[in-house]
Every structure is written in structure tokens, then in C-alpha cells.
Amino acid sequence: MVYEGSFGNTITPISGVENVKQGDNVTLQCNYTGAVQNLQWYRQYPRQALEYLLMSFETGGGSKANEEEHRISAEVNKDNKHVFLKLIDTEVTDAAVYYCALSPTVTETHPALYKNYLTMKHKLLFTN
């Protein structure tokens, strides 16, 4: 599934569901198009609010909601327009729906436009 925003930006998850075992390393990938201000990852547990994980920039750098969380990181491949979320040494508590999102670059200042983030999701399931 692809989500296209009003600025011609799209973001697409590469696989919808990942089946992993505890202790595995997992990389989730989304591809995007267009000029972006930043790329974000969110997590959502069943019947819970969306939880911000981190934000990355095409030019490098970014920020995490919890800087001490060393098992989660992101990487952006600007040339190929890929954004990755990496989870190291997964735990059962990592089972959730993960959303990749982008904020398009806007040439004129309009506060409401920055609220229109485009999102797509991955589902992380654990198997025996």
C-alpha cells in the first residue's frame, strides 16, 4: 500500500509483517519519494496511543524519544530514498505495529501543512 500526500510525496513499507524470534535483529524498511523535511518512526501497541520513537534527516543526524534506548536506531539512504528502522536483540515487548512517516518539505510557511505527516505501517510478530 502506498500513501500519497498533497505534495507528491509517497512512503511505502517494503514488507507488511515481520515474524521474528526473541533475540533476533530486525530491519524494517520504507521507501519514499519527493523532498522531505524529516522521516520518523512510531510504534503502537494494541489499544495504546501511538508512541514516537525517532526522527532522521536525509542530511544525517536526528533525535530519539529516549536517547538511552540503544537497541533502536534509524538510517536514511538519501540516494535510493530508503529509511530503515533497526531493532537489535529483539524482546517480546517489541511486538507492535511500527509506522514510518515523513514530513514533506514545504516551500511556504503554513503551520497546518506540517501536521500532515504521511504514514505507513509494519507489523512485528513473534514466533516460537
Question: Can you describe what each PLM-predicted range is?
Answer:
Residues 1-128:
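Extracellular domains of the immunoglobulin superfamily
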